[in-house]
Design a protein with these regions (language model features):
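Conserved metal-binding segment of the jelly-roll/cupin
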Residues: 41-65, 187-214
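Conserved short histidine dyad/triad with adjacent acidic residue
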Residues: 1-24, 139-171
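Intrinsically disordered, low-complexity linker/propeptide segments enriched in Ser/Thr/Gly/Pro
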Residues: 1, 16-17, 72-76, 166, ...
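Short Gly/Pro-enriched loop/turn and capping motifs at secondary-structure junctions
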Residues: 23-25, 58-60, 80-81, 172-174, ...
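A short beta-strand-loop-beta hairpin characteristic of the jelly-roll/cupin
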Residues: 16-46, 168-195, 233-235
């Protein structure tokens, strides 16, 4: 198997792991098999999923047991550095261990000819967000080749009370830096245009957008991440 994380580790911040298949007709299929261990319990799945690990919770190894076709994987955490905690600071889950407290499968909404939402973390009513106290806000979606030219995804300039990452990722494993699309986005009123795999960082309270998908030659992954979704705000 392909080993993503060989050893059991824990971190002083919440971690987010995302695994998304590229079968656009069956968005919940990973097209491979994943093994993910949390607090000594192994979870094996062949489905698109998002795994949230609370701070100081030991996890790993993480392995890809099988790949039927390329799939997308991403990890992030609420910290500037990724330094493992010493074992004396590890915290084991209390009570009965249930994977559904940590794993979220495909739950996208609002699919249309332009975009296909696959996963979302949005709002304190989500069982994972409720357990962890609102660690992340995020949406993961594909933009299709059927996206109309000059498709306006976000029409107005706005800001948030939290920093935001806006990520545009290629789906071609042999050409990962070529986005296969052209994007136009404004930051503080200044317009940028790019056609490469790109991460845009919008600091808290900094105006950003409009965001326009100018053209799409092949599907690409777009996802946003912000900390602390319970205080998510949208300020014009």
């Amino acid at each position: 198997p392909c080993v993503i994380e060989a050893e059991e580790k824990a971190y002083a911040f919440d971690m987010l792991y995302v695994f998304v298949g590229q079968d656009f007709e069956n968005q919940n299929e990973l097209c491979g098999e994943l093994s993910f261990t949390i607090a000594g319990h192994e979870y094996v799945t062949d489905k698109t999923c998002m795994i949230l690990v609370p701070k100081n919770t030991p996890h790993g190894p993480i392995r890809v047991n099988r790949v039927d076709q390329p799939f997308f994987t991403y990890c992030g955490g609420a910290s500037k550095e990724r330094v493992p905690e010493s074992r004396d600071r590890w915290v084991m889950p209390e009570g009965e261990f249930r994977f559904e407290k940590y794993v979220l499968h495909g739950n996208g909404e609002d699919n249309n000819e332009a975009e296909q939402e696959v996963l979302r973390l949005h709002g304190s009513d989500n069982k994972i967000i409720g357990d962890f106290g609102g660690v992340f806000y995020g949406k993961f979606r594909w933009f299709r080749v059927t996206t109309p030219k000059d498709f306006i995804f976000a029409a107005e300039s706005h800001s948030h009370g939290q920093p935001e990452l806006l990520n545009f990722y290629s789906t071609d494993p042999d050409d990962p830096y070529n986005l296969g699309a052209t994007i136009s986005m404004e930051m503080m009123g200044e317009r940028y245009e790019f056609d490469q795999t790109t991460t845009v960082f919008a600091p808290a309270n900094q105006p950003h957008c409009p965001l326009k998908i100018m053209s799409v030659e092949r599907p690409f992954m777009f996802f946003t991440l912000m900390p602390d979704c319970k205080v998510y705000s949208l300020d014009k």
